Regions:
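Positively charged, small/polar-rich N-terminal and surface patches that mediate targeting and assembly
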Residues: 1-113
């Protein structure tokens, strides 16, 4: 099993969610996060004063999938989240040793569905 973590632009969340649904992903975790990379920050005006906003709002999606579905999920996220501009985000893939469905006690890949 693999955990896929994707950091994407907030306005792309719905597109990514629909793309994942189209490849059979039934659930995911979404967290509002802030960060910076090559995109750096930007300046904003507030009450006549200029402020540097260094951390930009992003959305972090997390989903655990069977190994054989990994490529399909990564491709779906990549297609849906891409704008072609700096700041589109990143995808990280991590190994998952175990999954447990708390309600039933089911473990392994059975607990994912």
């Amino acid at each position: 099993m693999k955990k896929v973590e994707a950091i994407v632009k907030p306005f792309k969340l719905e597109e990514v969610k629909e793309a994942l649904s189209a490849v059979g992903i039934q659930g995911l975790t979404v967290t509002e996060v802030k960060g910076f990379g090559r995109q750096k920050g930007h300046k904003e005006l507030y009450r006549g004063a200029e402020y540097m906003v260094e951390f930009l709002p992003k959305v972090k999606l997390e989903v655990v999938v069977q190994d054989e579905r990994l490529e399909q999920v990564v491709e779906a996220i990549t297609r849906a989240a891409a704008t072609g501009r700096i700041g589109d985000g990143k995808i990280f893939v991590l190994p998952v040793d175990e999954a447990v469905r708390i309600r039933t006690g089911e473990t392994g890949e059975i607990a994912l569905g």
